[in-house]
Amino acid sequence: MDQYNALHSFAHADGNYHLMGCMLSAASCNKWWMDEILKTKEYAKEQEAIVKLGENQVFYLPYLMGERSPHNDPSARAAFIGMSMDTTREEMTQAVLEGVAFGLRDSLEVARNLGIQIERTKICGGGAKSLLWKKIIANVMNLKVDVIESEEGPGYGAAILAAVGCGEFENVESAVDKLVHVVETVEPDAELVEKYEERYQKFKKYYPALKGLF
């Protein structure tokens, strides 16, 4: 259990517990940036212009609605850091995608500090449609990222639990084996992992530095 409540703990099926890291703004950060700032629906086209990973000097804090994991701070706010006269549209778009990945990494670090061994992760939903974002997440986390067939994460998971509860499956594991299908796996690249590790260590310093100003 997490004594600081950086992760949320829930009773799960079969007497187990579910630990959840909750970001209040993840894919919605990209939607806000594209819709409200860039005024475009061409999400894929904007991302196609990003060609170099791991070297962006612009950082983005993904706290549009405050943040839960790991900060539990409703007053936290989003911010761009590191811009100059040379900063491009593509670099800021990339910073948004990377900022969300760094936020996910924050929860991963809490879990690891609790002694939880994590070797790979699964992804679904709107963000899973972006090859670039999946690649960034894999390298920021240094994990294999499995993309599952269903785009509906919470709803699909609830349906699986209901099927187990109704006796359609013997247990959760057998239901998942039957109903959750991996359609793609994105693997981290050692060179990019090293670059993103350096950038993540910088990212971690920005929230504590700005906390008193939010």
Task: Describe each model-derived feature in a short phrase.
Residues 1-214:
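Active-site core segments that coordinate phosphate-bearing ligands/cofactors
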